UniProtKB/Swiss-Prot annotation:
Participates actively in the response to hyperosmotic and heat shock by preventing the aggregation of stress-denatured proteins, in association with DnaK and GrpE. It is the nucleotide exchange factor for DnaK and may function as a thermosensor. Unfolded proteins bind initially to DnaJ; upon interaction with the DnaJ-bound protein, DnaK hydrolyzes its bound ATP, resulting in the formation of a stable complex. GrpE releases ADP from DnaK; ATP binding to DnaK triggers the release of the substrate protein, thus completing the reaction cycle. One of its GO terms (biological process) is protein folding. Keywords: Chaperone, Cytoplasm, Stress response. Homodimer. It is found in: Cytoplasm. GO terms for cellular component: cytoplasm. PANTHER family: GRPE PROTEIN, GRPE PROTEIN HOMOLOG, MITOCHONDRIAL. It comes from Lactococcus lactis subsp. cremoris (strain MG1363). It comes from the Bacteria. This is Protein GrpE.
């Protein structure tokens, strides 16, 4: 072999080694870039998944709140009408307490009163309890000293009846309380 051929073979081997080194370095760089891109894509996917889950949960909450509000509207739909009818019911009660009514008039007023009370009960309106004073249901308009017959925090007299629609207070009872 000639000197030139030996030199060429040597150069080729060096070129192959350099190419091999470059190729390995280039491959490592490419792999590293791909790994970085993959990491970024995974971070982005995780971020979007979290956003999706938050939005999905928020939508479920909005739907749940909407359903609850609709149920509350249906449950308390007659609240305003009931409040207006209560004053008429009070007037009927006062009219029935008047002396000198004929039996027919009294019977007619009682029938109207009973039909109003029945209609209110059908809608869920109930008279509040008068067993003992409850500041959530009663308004104390007067206090009297407690005695054997009326212990402390008991209701002595009811000036105006109180009513509630389901568990919501429509009107507190005006009462006299023993202290």
């Amino acid at each position: 072999m000639s000197e030139e051929t030996k030199e060429e073979i040597k150069n080729e081997k060096v070129d192959e080694e350099v190419t091999e080194e470059l190729t390995e370095e280039a491959l490592e760089d490419i792999v590293e870039e791909e790994i970085n891109e993959l990491d970024e894509a995974q971070k982005l996917a995780t971020e979007w998944e979290n956003k999706f889950l938050r939005v999905s949960a928020e939508m479920q909450n909005v739907q749940r709140r909407g359903n609850e509000e609709r149920l509350q509207l249906v449950k308390y739909r007659s609240q305003d009408l009931a409040k207006k009818i209560l004053s008429s019911l009070d007037n009927l009660e006062r009219a029935l307490a008047v002396e000198g009514l004929t039996d027919d008039v009294k019977k007619g007023l009682e029938m109207v009163q009973e039909s109003l009370i029945s209609a209110l009960k059908e809608e869920g309106v109930e008279e509040v309890s008068y067993e003992s004073f409850d500041h959530n249901l009663h308004m104390a308009v007067q206090t009297v000293p407690a005695d054997d017959e009326h212990p402390a925090d008991s209701i002595v007299q009811v000036f105006q009846k109180g009513y509630q629609l389901h568990e919501r207070l429509l009107r507190p009872a005006m009462v006299v309380v023993a202290q």
